[in-house]
C-alpha cells in the first residue's frame, strides 16, 4: 500500500519538499543555512508572539512594558533575549547564506535569487522596526535618523517622512504603526520563504561544483535531515550561550535609557548587522548620494546574474574570483567596523575607501576576473 505521505494532498507537498526531495549528493555544510533560516524564522515568530502579549505600543508605557516583561513575566527575560539575540543569529545565517550563493553561482537561478533578495530587504525592514519598539534612546534616535533619510528624495521627501511618522516628529503614531508592521511582516516573510522554496524546487539545488547533478541525486531524508540537525545544534548552542551568558553583548547600552527627544546620544548607530550599510551611507557627504549608495549596496545583489561573465558557474576552480570574493568579505568586515566608529579621522577616509572598493569589486573586478579566467582556460 502506498504510504499516506505520498497520497494525502497536504502530506504530499511536505513529502516532496522535505522527505523524498531529490538532492545533489555532494552539497556541503554551506547548504545548511536555508533550513537554519527557517528555524530562526519560527523561533522569532513564536518569541515575538509571546512578547506582543505583554508589550504596549504607546510612547509612555512602551519602555516600562519591556521592563515589566523582563522582571514580572514568567521567563519574560528569556523570551526577550532569545528574540533580541535570535535576530543576530538570523542575520548571521542570512549573510552566510547570501555569501554561499555568491561563491557557488546560485544567483543564476533567477527567480529564487530575486525572491531571496526581496526576503533580505523584508527581514532588514522587520529588524529595523523591531529595534524601535523598546523605545530606548537608540530606538528613538535610530528611527529618527533612518526615516529622515527619505527626506532626501526630491520633491516628495518631506511629505513622505511626515506621512511615515504620522506627524511632525517620531511619536506615538510612529511607534504604533511600527509595531503593526513589525507584527505583520514576519508572516509576509514566511509566504516569501515558501515561494523561494517553490522556485528552488523547480530547478533543484545547486552544488559546489556548479555542474548538473541530475545523474547523482539522493533523498533529502535521512541524509540531509541528519546533516542539518548538526548545524541546528551548533546554532542553538551558540544562541543559548549568548542568551544565558552575555545577552547584551550585541546590544547598545543607550537602549537601557528611556527615549528622550531632547537629548541626542553621542554616537547614533544601528545594530551590528546594519553597520556595513550604515558605513556606506555615511561615507558620502551628500544626503541623497548616501541614501542612493545605501539602497544600491543591497540592490546590487539583484544584478549579480548580469555580472556573471565566467564560463564556470561556481568559484571552486576560479582562483582569481576566489581572491576577489575573500577581499569582498574582508571589505564588508572593515565596513562593519567603521559603521560603529565615530565620524572622525581616520575612520572617514577608511570608510570611503572601503565603500568604493565594495562596489568596485562587485561591479568591475569580479566580471573582469571572469573574462580573464575564460581566457586562461584556453591556454
From Swiss-Prot:
<keyword id="KW-0249">Electron transport</keyword>
<comment type="subunit">
    <text>The cytochrome bc1 complex contains 11 subunits: 3 respiratory subunits (MT-CYB, CYC1 and UQCRFS1), 2 core proteins (UQCRC1 and UQCRC2) and 6 low-molecular weight proteins (UQCRH/QCR6, UQCRB/QCR7, UQCRQ/QCR8, UQCR10/QCR9, UQCR11/QCR10 and a cleavage product of UQCRFS1). This cytochrome bc1 complex then forms a dimer.</text>
</comment>
<feature type="transmembrane region" description="Helical">
    <location>
        <begin position="178"/>
        <end position="198"/>
    </location>
</feature>
<dbReference type="GO" id="GO:0005743">
    <property type="term" value="C:mitochondrial inner membrane"/>
</dbReference>
<comment type="similarity">
    <text>Belongs to the cytochrome b family.</text>
</comment>
<feature type="transmembrane region" description="Helical">
    <location>
        <begin position="226"/>
        <end position="246"/>
    </location>
</feature>
<keyword id="KW-0479">Metal-binding</keyword>
<keyword id="KW-0349">Heme</keyword>
<dbReference type="InterPro" id="IPR030689">
    <property type="entry name" value="Cytochrome_b"/>
</dbReference>
<keyword id="KW-0472">Membrane</keyword>
<dbReference type="InterPro" id="IPR036150">
    <property type="entry name" value="Cyt_b/b6_C_sf"/>
</dbReference>
<dbReference type="GO" id="GO:0006122">
    <property type="term" value="P:mitochondrial electron transport, ubiquinol to cytochrome c"/>
</dbReference>
<feature type="binding site" description="axial binding residue">
    <location>
        <position position="196"/>
    </location>
    <ligand>
        <name>heme b b566</name>
    </ligand>
</feature>
<dbReference type="InterPro" id="IPR005798">
    <property type="entry name" value="Cyt_b/b6_C"/>
</dbReference>
<feature type="transmembrane region" description="Helical">
    <location>
        <begin position="33"/>
        <end position="53"/>
    </location>
</feature>
<feature type="binding site" description="axial binding residue">
    <location>
        <position position="182"/>
    </location>
    <ligand>
        <name>heme b b562</name>
    </ligand>
</feature>
<dbReference type="InterPro" id="IPR016174">
    <property type="entry name" value="Di-haem_cyt_TM"/>
</dbReference>
<keyword id="KW-0408">Iron</keyword>
<keyword id="KW-0496">Mitochondrion</keyword>
<feature type="transmembrane region" description="Helical">
    <location>
        <begin position="347"/>
        <end position="367"/>
    </location>
</feature>
<dbReference type="Pfam" id="PF00032">
    <property type="entry name" value="Cytochrom_B_C"/>
</dbReference>
<feature type="transmembrane region" description="Helical">
    <location>
        <begin position="77"/>
        <end position="98"/>
    </location>
</feature>
<feature type="binding site">
    <location>
        <position position="201"/>
    </location>
    <ligand>
        <name>a ubiquinone</name>
    </ligand>
</feature>
<feature type="transmembrane region" description="Helical">
    <location>
        <begin position="320"/>
        <end position="340"/>
    </location>
</feature>
<keyword id="KW-0679">Respiratory chain</keyword>
<dbReference type="InterPro" id="IPR048259">
    <property type="entry name" value="Cytochrome_b_N_euk/bac"/>
</dbReference>
<dbReference type="Pfam" id="PF00033">
    <property type="entry name" value="Cytochrome_B"/>
</dbReference>
<keyword id="KW-0999">Mitochondrion inner membrane</keyword>
<keyword id="KW-0813">Transport</keyword>
<dbReference type="InterPro" id="IPR027387">
    <property type="entry name" value="Cytb/b6-like_sf"/>
</dbReference>
<feature type="binding site" description="axial binding residue">
    <location>
        <position position="83"/>
    </location>
    <ligand>
        <name>heme b b562</name>
    </ligand>
</feature>
<feature type="binding site" description="axial binding residue">
    <location>
        <position position="97"/>
    </location>
    <ligand>
        <name>heme b b566</name>
    </ligand>
</feature>
<dbReference type="GO" id="GO:0046872">
    <property type="term" value="F:metal ion binding"/>
</dbReference>
<dbReference type="InterPro" id="IPR048260">
    <property type="entry name" value="Cytochrome_b_C_euk/bac"/>
</dbReference>
<comment type="function">
    <text>Component of the ubiquinol-cytochrome c reductase complex (complex III or cytochrome b-c1 complex) that is part of the mitochondrial respiratory chain. The b-c1 complex mediates electron transfer from ubiquinol to cytochrome c. Contributes to the generation of a proton gradient across the mitochondrial membrane that is then used for ATP synthesis.</text>
</comment>
<keyword id="KW-0830">Ubiquinone</keyword>
<keyword id="KW-1133">Transmembrane helix</keyword>
<dbReference type="GO" id="GO:0045275">
    <property type="term" value="C:respiratory chain complex III"/>
</dbReference>
<dbReference type="InterPro" id="IPR005797">
    <property type="entry name" value="Cyt_b/b6_N"/>
</dbReference>
<feature type="transmembrane region" description="Helical">
    <location>
        <begin position="113"/>
        <end position="133"/>
    </location>
</feature>
<keyword id="KW-0812">Transmembrane</keyword>
<dbReference type="GO" id="GO:0008121">
    <property type="term" value="F:ubiquinol-cytochrome-c reductase activity"/>
</dbReference>
